[in-house]
Amino acid sequence: MELKFLGEPCLTTVSEPVSEVDEQLRAFISGMFRVMRGAGGVGLAAPQVGRTVRVFVVDVEHHVRAFINPQITAASEEQSSYEEGCLSIPHIYERVLRPRRVSVQYLDENGKRCAVDADGILARVIQHEYDHLDGILFLDRIDEKRRDDALRRYAALRGTIR
């Protein structure tokens, strides 16, 4: 299992719902946690390792969990701006405006229906990873000028021409 980077089609593809929570999925989720922690991340979505299924994992502020088929059911009108990065776009950071709080329903690794009301950094990580499931990158959430600048910086870091 390897990280996928900006330019890979899986990062801009809408993910499919998980049909069954089984041992194979649990093993995949364990691998996701290993990749995320190995890269020093706090969240990782399945498309970032090449599988376009609706799963992400988080490890932030003592909240360590997998979200299977998550649905954001509510988001606060109050927003906050915070610098975000992404394991799939290394060394690029930009401020992103997002709702401060979200409510999420999801299945856990045992297929149990769960819900969480998140705020602060946990809410931000959930929203960032949830976006991946819809083929949205954090750079899609910023203005065009900043996005173009970030893409130029990324291309220079990757040694490519865009």
UniProtKB/Swiss-Prot annotation:
What's the domain of life for this entry?
A: Bacteria
Gene3D superfamilies named among the record's database cross-references: Peptide deformylase
Q: Which cofactor does it need?
A: Fe(2+)
Q: EC? A: 3.5.1.88
The family classification in the record reads: Belongs to the polypeptide deformylase family.
Which reaction is catalysed here?
Answer: N-terminal N-formyl-L-methionyl-[peptide] + H2O = N-terminal L-methionyl-[peptide] + formate
The residues that hold Fe cation are: C86, H128, H132
Q: Which organism is it from?
A: Treponema pallidum (strain Nichols)
The record ties this protein, via Pfam families, to:
Pep_deformylase
State the UniProt keywords alphabetically: Hydrolase, Iron, Metal-binding, Protein biosynthesis
Reported function: Removes the formyl group from the N-terminal Met of newly synthesized proteins. Requires at least a dipeptide for an efficient rate of reaction. N-terminal L-methionine is a prerequisite for activity but the enzyme has broad specificity at other positions.
Question: Which PANTHER family does the UniProt entry name for this protein?
Answer: PEPTIDE DEFORMYLASE
Give the first-level EC class, as a single word.
Answer: hydrolase
Query: Looking at the keywords, is Iron present?
Result: yes
Keyword Membrane in the entry? The reply is no
UniProt protein name: Peptide deformylase
Question: Which cysteines are disulphide-bonded?
Answer: none
Identify which residues the record assigns to the active site: E129
GO MF, any single term:
peptide deformylase activity
In the UniProt record, the gene name given for this protein reads def
**Cofactor notes:** Binds 1 Fe(2+) ion.
Q: Name one GO biological process term.
A: co-translational protein modification
